[in-house]
Amino acid sequence: MKLLLLSALLGCLATAYAAPAEGIVKWCVKSEQELRKCHDLAAKVAEFSCVRKDGSFECIQAIKGGEADAITLDGGDIYTAGLTNYGLQPIIAEDYGEDSDTCYYAVAVAKKGTAFGFKTLRGKKSCHTGLGKSAGWNIPIGTLVTESQIRWAGIEDRPVESAVSDFFNASCAPGATMGSKLCQLCKGDCSRSHKEPYYDYAGAFQCLKDGAGDVAFIKPLAVPAAEKASYELLCKDGTRASIDSYKTCHLARVPAHAVVSRKDPELANRIYNKLVAVKDFNLFSSDGYAAKNLMFKDSAQKLVQLPTTTDSFLYLGAEYMSTIRSLKKSQATGASSRAIKWCAVGHAEKGKCDTWTINSFADGESKISCQDAPTVEECIKKIMRKEADAIAVDGGEVYTAGKCGLVPVMVEQYDADLCSAPGEASSYYAVAVAKKGSGLTWKTLKGKRSCHTGLGRTAGWNIPMGLIHQETNDCDFTKYFSKGCAPGSEVGSPFCAQCKGSGKAVGDEYRCKARSEEQYYGYTGAFRCLVEDAGDVAFIKHTIVPESTDGNGPDWAKDLKSSDFELLCQDGTTQPVTKFSECHLAKVPAHAVITRPETRGDVVSILLELQAKFGSSGSDSSFRMFQSSVEKNLLFKDSTKCLQEIPKGTKYQDFLGKEYMIAMQSLRKCSDSTSDLEKACTFHSCQQKE
């Protein structure tokens, strides 16, 4: 008995002593100087401990394996940490204050009076913060390769380091192979750590100051204020400027250093909360440790938590990722086939897309191939990553895609007469529909049940909720509607309460998902929600009632009459569904095809070619792009008569129009109405698309 009690007591003690370890943040450090600073932090704040590794790569491995929890990395290392074999994500960004917030400038610096510019760097000696780092390597070398100053055919020809060695006379690029020309100017072991005196921003500047190198690739703040007058910036146009002119003379503006960790929301919150709670210790000072930028950059002023869905790609942005890929030659080429990769959402769309691919085969290849994703947002991410090329989306999704750097290139036209003689921009009416005789009006919607095409979609959410927000100035729409179905909402939200799912009795993983398997998703889905009495009002497009009634609809709608429904007008009256031009919530832009700016030409030319063959009056009747058999509105809206090219250079704001942009800006005052993807795409001021 005593033995049992002793065992139990020891077990309790072990649990008691082990418990605090769960709350400890294990910080990974790369040098003895960082280790000293980390130990001083841990002495002040018991929730921190320190793990010493030789470099960033070893820290990334340690974090993946759970030996460490976090480290602050620059953009180049954030890219590496986010690769599939490591799977880490940025969770917290450094903020450098009003001038640059969560971004910083990458610049080229030389001593004043030296007679060369950025266009005449060949044969000079160079100082780099480190191999693969943003300001010190990726940006300057990427720029020199892009401008054809450094001649490099690609990794299959030779490593980029070899091309850089041929370009510069000698260099110090910590992390390069010891004994190579890239280590020739280094003062220590050429390691990518503070063991090398010329490592990092301060080290690269010291390399220049000591006369070892002619040019240093750093950030402006690396030049001490007292020494600015002795140095100049090298501008990309070949001119020079003062150090303080970095806003107009720089190589690029890049995302800030960020804390990375494993993909664990609870761990991310714990790390952030522990860091912001630190008192009596300056995280952003390296004074007294004989090195700079230890654990964090000394120029950081605060830390900002990132949206939970932010991954390395979204954090770094498409432009910076393209620069990194250009140095690794890992970007998708695909120029030889000219096939476009269409993104399909859900099984039904993938099935139609596969049929489109098969019918498009000619001369041994197809003009279309298919990628699939669970949601439109995931498709947008795939297009950004070059895993897909195009998708047709609603105006609200055009808005989000535009914020992420994509562009609208073709628009659905619903009037056949305008296909041959385009005039006014293609559009449709967003309407509110109720059952006739319900007594419901626009003025009496509060407390009722609502049916939406999807969260963030134009007719189904942005327009009606934007109008309601303008009336109430309240962002909590659950106070306005009692419940409803808005696919894409958080599970457990009142806006998921009325969703139907795929019809499975148990374990329905598609319930409330923004995809075709959710039977109340999209225009016809929202109308079905109203028909089956899951809601009192449906927010849809003006053509949906006539397309789904009077014998025109699917089986569930075969006995419906259009006269059994009515439109709710904003003035509190009701009208027959045929009076949409007089009774609507807004006239909005049609659905559009989105892609990356650089693939615009291919997407437009291939779609025009395929439309001539498979369009409404195409030459090949074996497949029709604008018809859906299994479900409605697959890939394109079934009411589409043709696709029309949007003039080159049209920004998403111009396509959506002033009224729609005003409605979106009003709705975006409600943070809950902004998707995590949009938040991630607009987090950095240097990544935002005007």
Swiss-Prot record:
It comes from the Eukaryota. Hydrogencarbonate 1 binds at T129, S134, G136, W137. PROSITE patterns: TRANSFERRIN_LIKE_1 (PS00205), TRANSFERRIN_LIKE_2 (PS00206), TRANSFERRIN_LIKE_3 (PS00207), TRANSFERRIN_LIKE_4 (PS51408). Fe(3+) 1 binds at D74, Y104, Y201, H257. Residues 25-329, 340-669 form the Transferrin-like domain. One of its GO terms (biological process) is iron ion transport. Abundant in liver and serum with smaller amounts found in the stomach and kidney. Fe(3+) 2 binds at D394, Y428, Y523, H591. Its main location: secreted. Keywords: Disulfide bond, Glycoprotein, Ion transport, Iron, Iron transport, Metal-binding, Repeat, Secreted, Signal, Transport. Transferrins are iron binding transport proteins which can bind two Fe(3+) ions in association with the binding of an anion, usually bicarbonate. It is responsible for the transport of iron from sites of absorption and heme degradation to those of storage and utilization. Serum transferrin may also have a further role in stimulating cell proliferation. Belongs to the transferrin family. This is Serotransferrin-1. It comes from Salmo salar.
